[in-house]
From Swiss-Prot:
Residues 95-292 form the ABC transmembrane type-1 domain. Keywords: Cell inner membrane, Cell membrane, Membrane, Transmembrane, Transmembrane helix, Transport. It is found in: Cell inner membrane. One of its GO terms (cellular component) is plasma membrane. It comes from Shigella flexneri serotype 5b (strain 8401). This is Glutathione transport system permease protein GsiC. The gene is gsiC. Its main location: membrane. InterPro entries: BPD_transp_1_N (IPR045621), MetI-like (IPR000515), MetI-like_sf (IPR035906). Pfam families: BPD_transp_1 (PF00528), BPD_transp_1_N (PF19300). It comes from the Bacteria.
Amino acid sequence: MLNYVIKRLLGLIPTLFIVSVLVFLFVHMLPGDPARLIAGPEADAQVIELVRQQLGLDQPLYHQFWHYISNAVQGDFGLSMVSRRPVADEIASRFMPTLWLTITSMVWAVIFGMAAGIIAAVWRNRWPDRLSMTIAVSGISFPAFALGMFLIQVFSVELGWLPTVGADSWQHYILPSLTLGAAVAAVMARFTRASFVDVLSEDYMRTARAKGVSETWVVLKHGLRNAMIPVVTMMGLQFGFLLGGSIVVEKVFNWPGLGRLLVDSVEMRDYPVIQAEILLFSLEFILINLVVDVLYAAINPAIRYK
């Protein structure tokens, strides 16, 4: 297992290098001139050229890439073109709000989604199954921005129960986490149901029932563990999507996180921040997949990696 983990970690190097090249080319293909955006609409050509020189944008593209990649290897992602602060500081100040929002969304989505999926599988083709799957389909179908606006209108504007923007208290997390986790809960419910339906028809489940084991214990002990392997895969992927895909929700709720920082950086063509954030999201996905693979062996000891 240790050798497998080390090999996977070493595989990060070429993967991140390829991502770095693609991201660098992508951001430089974006329309618009960051020097003009930063200088302002009233700036003349001389001022814009001066800003371009200060940002290093007057250098050849290959020179800019070499400067970027050589510094990135040392953990230096440069300065933000907009704030002139270190990119690492910009990301660090936004990381924790996004992480806590992701964890909050994931916790309630997994609990609700797995419970709904198990109930739907145990009472298959009956009203609990139909109700759970109807709610799940609704959760998948409803766009995040529309759900967020609806929740703000009802619980913040009309009822005045919850705040709309900010991340200062636990109350600020309720509406964004509900919005962000709704689709994940729906996917988890459908995936758990499909996995449990397969497990419930296995011979060891019938054997446990024949031995007089209670249905609750059969479902929780024998069914849950064996149905968890594909579900864990989905949990890992969904966590990665939540962590890197909260852009719409953060924009709707004016959340001070990485998603909003990325949107603002794209609008202002802040190349260093865009490159660093996408690299961070890529690293997160790779590490999450590695953790999922390790969890496989913990859930099912029959799985071994070489």
